[in-house]
């Protein structure tokens, strides 16, 4: 769910910039604006699910393009819910899955150079807290 709010009046408005919003990287490397119909909810698979499914589910690279120019007086408001394991929970691979299944080198092909790969941050036997700390350190 997203809404746009005029920061001067506090009123909910339509998006003043058709280019602004959530973009995802498709499996063939295209940057695609993610659009949902009104009242719909989108689910995005993250790297934790990628590890815990042994690569059956793949994380979706994404970014938000902000409003520019006179539209910058409008804010984009979203409500995100992050589902994650307990801090000390194991991030072990499921039985029968391999490191190669989970950290598919092909999936890294379309990442921007500024994005640290899953392969560089997650190692076998890490727990969720260790993985989170490695991820925060890589990006901040």
What are these regions (language model features)?
Residues 1-140:
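C-terminal flanking tails of non-heme Fe-dependent oxygenases
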């Amino acid at each position: 769910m997203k809404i746009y709010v005029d920061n001067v009046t506090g009123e909910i408005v339509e998006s003043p910039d058709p280019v602004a919003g959530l973009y995802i990287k498709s499996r063939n490397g295209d940057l695609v604006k993610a659009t949902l119909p009104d009242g719909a909810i989108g689910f995005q698979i993250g790297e934790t699910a990628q590890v815990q499914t042994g690569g059956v589910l793949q994380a979706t690279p994404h970014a938000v393009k902000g409003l520019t120019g006179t539209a910058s007086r409008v804010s984009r408001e979203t409500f995100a819910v992050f589902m994650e394991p307990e801090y000390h929970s194991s991030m072990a691979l499921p039985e029968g899955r391999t490191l190669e299944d989970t950290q598919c080198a092909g999936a890294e092909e379309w990442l921007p150079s500024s994005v640290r790969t899953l392969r560089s941050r997650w190692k076998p036997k890490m727990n969720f807290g260790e993985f989170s700390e490695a991820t925060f350190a890589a990006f901040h």
